[in-house]
Amino acid sequence: NKQHVGTFGDLGTFSFFPGKNLGAYGDAGGIITNNKKYAEKCLRLRNHGSINKYDHTMIGKNSRLDTIQSAILDIKLKDYKKEVLKKRNQLAQIYLEKLKNIKGLYLFQKKSYAVNSYHQFVVRTLKRDQLKKYLDDKKIQTMIHYPYMLSDLKIFKNQKGHKNLTNAKELGNKILSLPISQDHTKKEILYIVKNIKNFFSVNKK
């Protein structure tokens, strides 16, 4: 609804990890806010608690984004909407059109009121592991990006409030990320579609 991601709260955070749609060449990230108080605090926290040299008013750390990474992101950002976002949406549309009528394969439909960045293109199927192996054998790399829920991690496992996450667990065992990036071609996506269709044609039960 024409409101940018990251602007729904007091602060928004973005990862610029190299594998992201808008990625630097090393670890990087950013925070946005229109609150001057929070902005100043973030500036201090990222620089050992100081904005002006030797004026340390709180405990902070070195979280400054170096100039090289900033320059890389600045160049990439200029082409992000025109090149990256547009290309990923075009390729995602091929998936959505070509895979929509396959029995046993479920797609996450895009919403009319939102623009999707398609950092990942995720499908859902009971035959997730078999499909992944089939595509791997065809030299098509797929990913299970998040094989564990947060509640399964040791740090959270014994905390209260997440004993019966049956829907999340069920979904987590069915989802698979298909290849998608601005560097993929239409021909490559159609090849992936062809192999997915082949898999389901011989694995109907």
Language model: regions and residue ranges:
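A residue-level structural signature of the nucleotidyltransferase/glycosyltransferase Rossmann-like core
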Residues: 21-22, 30, 65
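Short beta-strand-to-turn element immediately C-terminal to the catalytic PLP-Schiff-base lysine
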Residues: 14-15, 29-34
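Conserved active-site segment immediately N-terminal to the catalytic lysine
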Residues: 1-23, 52-57
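PLP-dependent aminotransferase class I/II
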Residues: 34-205
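Solvent-exposed polar/charged
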Residues: 6-7, 24, 31, 170
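Adenylate-forming
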Residues: 12, 24-28, 71-73
